[in-house]
């Protein structure tokens, strides 16, 4: 994390992620070393294949030049044969590394073959020179010294860098030893010439620089490869997580909605998230849609638990949830067997539809058989638990509307006249029997069932009489004998969820199996990772990025290794260069070496000969200081979290460093300056030569046989080696466009070739050659061209790895965004299924099929029903708008005491206040075990704090009643809007009946196939009765609720003794509301704990806040006014 250090920050976290030590430790931490080792073996095999092609090309060109340019070919047949033979031996020895099984068992062979190949080429090169020294008195220079060192560091399969360094130093030492023995002719002359002008120290510095360049390439290559590997690992993890998350999201949606409804909803949620992030809040972008479909020819089953009220008031919360979970779980499993889709259950009511998702000609039979099966199940549950319960079931066939309305706590539901008829058949039915209509009977196999006429209560029901519906009673299925029934019940019991709470969590073996599958998929993806920039498919325009599939052309790399998508290419070039410090330290090291060589090799005495090299060396040291100062500060202070105050100079250095890393133009300018200044340093050496004077001195030497002065002109092989280092340096800078580096290297090569063949052809021609009678200028040119070719090939490999790595990072960011979007949508969906306080519980506990229940001492429950609302398609559109407005009000009841929407039943809106885990008297033991000890203790402390004052919990009644009044205001405003629309003014009269009751409530999640959160208890039953017995335009409350409201200063008028089913006659009250829809006040003895709760939010203020927040409420008002 960034640490505040005085006036600036030392943020080294991103730079540290590109350090070799960090990447290696990260691989070890993720236990990826074995996979990385296998991937690196594949990489080295691709490097070897590249080296084979390169070495064959170099050997062929070298031998062809020898045979084409030398007239006395007999003398060079030995050289040609030795070169070809050595190439064959190298390829033969190194080819064994392509045998995967052998290398897997004998990894030591990779290093051993590298040593053998290197020393073979060294001895062949030295043998050729020594042979001609003794056989033909030719003093020859070596040809493969630079080439072998490059080969060791860049192409040979040496996994550990220390091994490559030791081998390269050995090769360098052998060549220096050859120079001492055969060129300097003994250690005495070597010592005397070591620090002489143009002496041996120049060659030693040259070899040291070659090794530095090789080490740099190894470090940079290992860093890039490890970074790519880790990025790929993260990408695969994100892809697997996203795949699982999408599967989870689909399962969640399918558990509440059929696919034809869930898919548009899923896309709509994700689209809204994206638009919100983009700041799009237009009317068209956020219009409400109504996800409702028409389904003809279906059968509707309504089932009601007889004596349910007694059940909820006598059982403990744990026992109640367990019984309901067992019962409804059995129903869900039976419905699944008979292809009937459960819609929802409402306390004691369970209803479902056959033929909804897929047309089913046998829908009536399936519904009736399911009804009889449900009766059998409840009989078994009654016997198991010793309960006095039974089942009353009604079935009707016809048409219906199905879908989702509202915008909070989304639930799939059904509407229509035939749905109402099915409900009436259930309420007028006989316990233990299936009550069906004539429409259902017409679709039944009548010979299968025992059918009787319907009860008298049904014949006298006004709705059934109005539509002339005749009903029938079915008591049993004649085709299902007791043995088959018992067998089916046993099967259901074996998979029933009644004991889900006792089931163990996922076993360790299952976890290990999942981990094994994950690692196997990782290994398979790693095996697909590309390893080479040279691919026939790439030449055809097909590029693969380890996906196993061809990617679109706009993401491909062309033959120049640039993205064909210019936007992607620009993004790649604008990356921060975290490898800059390594490039600049290498440049400084090589630059200082070039300055040293220039000072040792030049004979001119002039101010520019010293000022320019000194200036170049100074600037390079300053750039190196800027590049490494941040690393130094982090090593000294940041790593150990040592507090330190940085002065202005340090902050200035930090800012310059960050500016360089983040600016491509600045880095290119620095790069070009270093290349040009280094080339000028070499030019000083070359320009110190007086060509005419050298030619005359050389002629006089040949005529008069005296030794020429050593420093009359530059040493050609010294300058050639300098340019070779410069070409290496040209390609060392990371995150400089490869086209720029290639262009600079080509210009350097061409400029030097002009010097060789034109400007100083005489000097180069009379320098030491590498083969007898082989023109020296050809030897110089060949070495420069080989160096350029090696560096260009290696740079393409590094650039390819960088481009693939970048493409993966881009894909990773896309996957992370997609994963974040999916995760966000999952949370939204969960919060629209379950109350927010148990979403985490569902993810942690219910996903493992564990029971969950809660017990609350004080909860206020509200039922609100729209009066005289016809359930046709036009009315459903209006109902959707009204319910959405009610849902919007919930946004203003999220503080302290939260109002939770429970469900919608037809035109009835059910909500509760006080369902907060902090107020829960008890929860399931599984929940407590799932909470960490610290969090659990804090949670218990909060509960005790709230439980110490029972009066504080009574405030939920005031909040719930305030929300109910806001609903009445919202409906009044909506009704005004509908009155201005000709087609909608007669849909509803805008009246609502509301009932509220408060007290102890039990809550939990039940069901086998769908997570359903519900509440039970006397307040739930009483609130429903208050609504059904209430008056339109009033809030009907119980005596206990009215007493609490009066304490908060709200008048409640006594209505009288009201008959309530299951309770008889009880006193009830109407909340005092004036004509302006405000509470009628009275003297208050208590006040809301949060003052903002004392001011009830009106619809007008709701719209004002909603417009400011671009909420959905303002959209609804706009939609209503524009209809």
From Swiss-Prot:
What is this enzyme's catalytic activity, as reactions?
ATP = 3',5'-cyclic AMP + diphosphate
Name where it mostly resides. membrane
Membrane topology type: Multi-pass membrane protein
Gene3D superfamilies assigned: Nucleotide cyclase
State the Gene Ontology terms under molecular function: adenylate cyclase activity; ATP binding; metal ion binding
Q: Which domain of life is it from?
A: Eukaryota
EC number(s) recorded for this UniProt protein: 4.6.1.1
- What's a single GO BP term from this record? intracellular signal transduction
Question: Null phenotype?
Answer: RNAi-mediated knockdown in sugar gustatory neurons does not affect sucrose response.
Q: On the Cytoplasmic side, which residues?
A: 1-47, 95-106, 159-163, 218-581, 630-667, 741-743, 794-1123
Query: Which residue stretches are annotated as topological domain Extracellular?
Result: 69-73, 128-137, 185-196, 603-608, 689-719, 765-772
An example of a Gene Ontology cellular component annotation for this protein is:
membrane
Record's subcellular location: Membrane
* Chain residues that bind Mg(2+): 348
Q: What is this protein called?
A: Adenylyl cyclase X E
Taxonomic lineage per UniProt? Eukaryota, Metazoa, Ecdysozoa, Arthropoda, Hexapoda
């Amino acid at each position: 994390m960034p640490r505040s250090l005085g006036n600036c920050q030392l943020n080294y976290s991103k730079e540290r992620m590109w350090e070799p030590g960090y990447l290696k430790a990260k691989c070890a931490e993720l236990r990826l070393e074995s996979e990385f080792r296998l991937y690196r073996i594949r990489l080295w095999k691709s490097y070897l294949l590249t080296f084979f092609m390169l070495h064959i090309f170099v050997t062929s060109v070298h031998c062809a030049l020898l045979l084409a340019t030398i007239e006395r070919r007999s003398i060079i047949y030995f050289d040609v044969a030795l070169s070809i033979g050595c190439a064959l031996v190298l390829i033969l020895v190194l080819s064994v590394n392509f045998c995967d099984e052998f290398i897997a068992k004998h990894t030591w062979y990779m290093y051993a073959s590298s040593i053998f190949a290197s020393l073979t080429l060294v001895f062949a090169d030295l043998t050729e020179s020594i042979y001609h020294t003794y056989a033909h008195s030719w003093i020859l220079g070596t040809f493969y010294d630079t080439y072998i060192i490059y080969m060791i560091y860049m192409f040979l399969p040496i996994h550990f860098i220390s091994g490559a360094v030791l081998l390269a130093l050995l090769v360098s030492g052998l060549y220096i030893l050859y120079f001492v023995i055969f060129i300097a002719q003994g250690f005495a002359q070597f010592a005397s010439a070591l620090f002489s002008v143009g002496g041996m120290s120049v060659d030693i510095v040259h070899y040291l620089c070659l090794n530095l360049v090789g080490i740099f390439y190894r470090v940079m290559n290992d860093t890039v490869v490890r970074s790519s590997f880790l990025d790929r690992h993260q990408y695969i993890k994100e892809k697997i997580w996203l795949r699982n998350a999408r599967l989870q999201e689909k399962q969640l949606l399918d558990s509440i909605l059929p696919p034809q409804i869930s898919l548009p909803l899923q896309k709509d949620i994700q689209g809204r998230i994206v638009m919100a992030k983009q700041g799009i809040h237009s009317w068209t972008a956020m219009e409400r849609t109504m996800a409702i479909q028409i389904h003809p020819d279906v059968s509707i089953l309504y089932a009601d638990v007889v004596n349910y009220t007694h059940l909820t008031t006598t059982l403990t919360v744990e026992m109640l949830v367990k019984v309901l979970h067992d019962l409804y779980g059995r129903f869900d499993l039976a419905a699944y067997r008979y292809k009937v889709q459960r819609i929802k259950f409402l306390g004691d009511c369970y209803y479902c539809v056959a033929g909804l998702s897929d047309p089913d000609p046998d829908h009536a039979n399936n519904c009736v058989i399911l009804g009889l099966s449900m009766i059998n199940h409840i009989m078994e549950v009654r016997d198991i638990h010793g309960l006095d319960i039974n089942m009353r079931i009604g079935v009707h066939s016809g048409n219906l509307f199905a879908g989702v309305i509202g915008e909070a706590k989304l639930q799939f539901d059904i509407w229509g006249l035939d749905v109402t008829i099915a409900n009436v058949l259930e309420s007028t039915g006989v316990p233990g029997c299936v009550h069906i209509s004539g429409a259902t009977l017409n679709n039944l196999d009548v010979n299968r069932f025992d059918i009787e006429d319907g009860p008298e209560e049904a014949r006298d029901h006004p709705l059934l009489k109005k539509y002339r519906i005749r009903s029938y009673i079915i008591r049993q299925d004649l085709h299902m004998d007791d043995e088959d029934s018992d067998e089916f019940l046993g099967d259901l019991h074996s998979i029933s969820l009644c004991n889900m709470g006792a089931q163990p969590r996922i076993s360790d073996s299952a976890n290990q199996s999942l981990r094994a599958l994950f690692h196997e998929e990782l290994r398979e993806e790693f095996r697909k990772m590309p390893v080479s920039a040279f691919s026939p498919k790439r030449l055809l325009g097909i590029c693969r990025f380890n996906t196993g599939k061809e990617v679109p052309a706009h993401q491909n790399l062309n033959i120049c290794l640039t993205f064909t998508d210019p936007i992607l290419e620009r993004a790649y070039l604008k990356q921060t260069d975290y490898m800059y410090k390594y490039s600049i330290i290498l440049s400084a090291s090589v630059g200082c070496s070039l300055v040293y060589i220039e000072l040792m090799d030049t004979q001119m005495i002039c101010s520019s000969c010293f000022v320019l090299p000194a200036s170049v060396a100074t600037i390079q040291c300053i750039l190196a200081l800027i590049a490494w100062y941040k690393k130094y500060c982090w090593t000294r202070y940041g790593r150990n979290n040592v507090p330190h105050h940085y002065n202005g100079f340090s902050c200035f250095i930090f800012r310059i460093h960050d500016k360089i890393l983040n600016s491509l133009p600045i880095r290119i300018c620095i790069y070009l300056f270093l290349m040009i200044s280094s080339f000028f340093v070499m030019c000083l050496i070359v320009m110190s030569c007086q060509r005419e004077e050298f030619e005359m001195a050389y002629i006089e030497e040949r005529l008069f046989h005296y030794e020429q002065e050593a420093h009359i002109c530059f040493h050609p092989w010294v300058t050639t080696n300098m340019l070779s280092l410069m070409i290496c340096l040209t390609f060392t800078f990371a995150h400089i466009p490869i086209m720029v580096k290639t262009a600079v290297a080509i210009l350097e090569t061409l400029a030097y070739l002009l010097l060789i063949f034109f400007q100083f052809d005489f000097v180069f021609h009379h320098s030491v050659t590498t083969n007898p009678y082989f023109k020296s200028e050809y030897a110089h040119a060949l070495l420069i061209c080989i160096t350029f070719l090696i560096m260009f090939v290696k740079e393409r490999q590094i650039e390819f790895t960088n481009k693939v790595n970048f493409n993966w990072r881009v894909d990773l960011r896309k996957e992370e965004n997609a994963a974040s979007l999916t995760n966000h949508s999952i949370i939204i969906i969960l919060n629209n299924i379950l109350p927010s306080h148990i979403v985490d519980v569902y993810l942690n506990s219910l996903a493992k099929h564990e029971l969950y229940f809660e017990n609350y001492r004080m909860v206020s429950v509200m039922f609100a029903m729209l009066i005289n609302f016809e359930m046709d398609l036009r009315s459903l559109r209006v109902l959707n708008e009204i319910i959405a407005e009610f849902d919007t009000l919930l946004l203003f009841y999220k503080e302290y005491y939260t109002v939770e929407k429970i469900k919608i039943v037809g035109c009835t809106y059910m909500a509760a206040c006080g369902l907060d885990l902090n107020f829960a008297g008890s929860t399931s033991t599984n929940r407590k075990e799932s909470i960490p000890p610290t969090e659990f203790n804090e949670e218990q402390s909060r509960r005790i704090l709230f439980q110490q004052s029972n009066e504080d919990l009574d405030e939920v009644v005031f909040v719930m009643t305030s929300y109910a009044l806001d609903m009445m205001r919202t409906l009044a405003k909506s009704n005004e809007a509908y009155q201005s629309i000709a087609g909608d003014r007669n849909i509803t009269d805008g009246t609502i009946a509301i009932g509220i009751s408060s007290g102890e409530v039990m809550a939990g999640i039940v069901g086998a196939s769908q997570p359903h959160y519900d509440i039970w208890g006397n307040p739930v039953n009483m609130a429903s009765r208050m609504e059904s017995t209430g008056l339109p335009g009033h809030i009907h409350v119980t005596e206990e609720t009215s007493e609490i409201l009066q304490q908060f200063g709200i008048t409640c008028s006594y209505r009288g003794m009201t008959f309530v089913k299951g309770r008889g006659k009880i006193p009830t009250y109407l909340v005092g509301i004036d004509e302006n829809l405000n509470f009628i006040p009275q003297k208050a003895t208590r006040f809301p704990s949060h003052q903002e709760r004392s001011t009830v939010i009106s619809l007008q203020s709701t719209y004002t806040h909603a417009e400011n927040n671009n909420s959905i409420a303002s959209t609804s008002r706009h939609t209503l006014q524009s209809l």
